């Protein structure tokens, strides 16, 4: 299932939230009825919190079924909320505070449950990132941009990336993430940082409400969500 939506009138929903194959984190600002829809479409348990008192969960955090990386600026109360949520849902997820100067991990890491791409800006943390997420990685940029996380969205079936990603980069991403297909596209009527506009797993996707019909078709194809 795929739906289009806004979070409090905002279409860059990937900046504000994080979804994996097994859980989702959403900011306190998301309305309860919207949150229930997220649970239904993505078929995962979800919780609401802020990270470092910020609603930018998707920019600050990155995770998959194996692990969750949060910035060092996260509060002890927020860590406790995440741990309680994981325990309540019997989720065995490695939770790690990464002590990096650049705290926008969601913008700088693209992951699924098979591999991850790490921006060159975080290459010194490659080993700990691999250990927490439980996958092998590739280090590099694509589309001449270091923001490999916000410029892509990946599931265990497919991946959508920035439209200026070249053919060699597409092959590299395909190999690292171990998916059958990587497509290029935009969302929210021309936004190239597709990760900032889309939440997805193999069961469904939630897309920013400004996304056009042609964009939606490319998203469905890349993520293998065509019924």
Swiss-Prot record:
Q: What does this protein do?
A: Binds to the 50S ribosomal subunit and prevents its association with the 30S ribosomal subunit to form the 70S initiation complex.
Q: Name one Pfam family in it.
A: eIF-6
Extract the InterPro entries matched here. eIF6
Q: Which GO terms describe its biological process?
A: cytosolic ribosome assembly
Homology family = Belongs to the eIF-6 family.
Q: Which UniProt keywords apply?
A: Initiation factor, Protein biosynthesis
Q: Mention one GO molecular function.
A: ribosome binding
Q: What is the designated name of this protein?
A: Translation initiation factor 6
